[in-house]
Amino acid sequence: MNTCIQLLILCLVTVINSENSTDHSTENTIENETEDVTKTELLKTIENETENVIETELPETVETEIQTEALNLPQSPEQRYCRSKGQYCSRTYFHRCCGNLVCQLHGFFNGTCVDCLAERKFCIWSSECCSGRCRLFRCRKNTHVKVIHY
């Protein structure tokens, strides 16, 4: 609401300035009109204009963007800072992955949430790797494979 008032005042000032620079004969009428306008009249006109806005006037892209963003929102308050699978993560508290997902980094504090890390991806703990083995900050192939004979 305050921004609407500021925009309306800014428009009035620009109209006054443009009229003053182009035509000096209308200077007195513009000043009289601006003096007659009170703050309550400005508020009433802004309220009337905002009431006339219909939902169908919004572009379809805005509506679909709002729907897709609503799907990506965390469902509970404790998931406020965590991201779901495929979303951006940075391995920080504010951009961490939810649940058992891990952050696969593509750059410095730039990654994507995945189920587990593939071979030769940056890791800190063995639980992050699909193979279950993290060695020297890289996921390694699990060489300890149990062979079960039937």
Curated annotation (Swiss-Prot):
Residues 1-18 form the signal peptide. GO terms for cellular component: extracellular region. Glycans are attached at residues 20, 32, 48, 110. Its main location: secreted. Keywords: Disulfide bond, Glycoprotein, Knottin, Secreted, Signal. It comes from the Eukaryota. Belongs to the UPF0506 family. The presence of a 'disulfide through disulfide knot' structurally defines this protein as a knottin. This is UPF0506 protein SJCHGC09643. It comes from Schistosoma japonicum (Blood fluke).
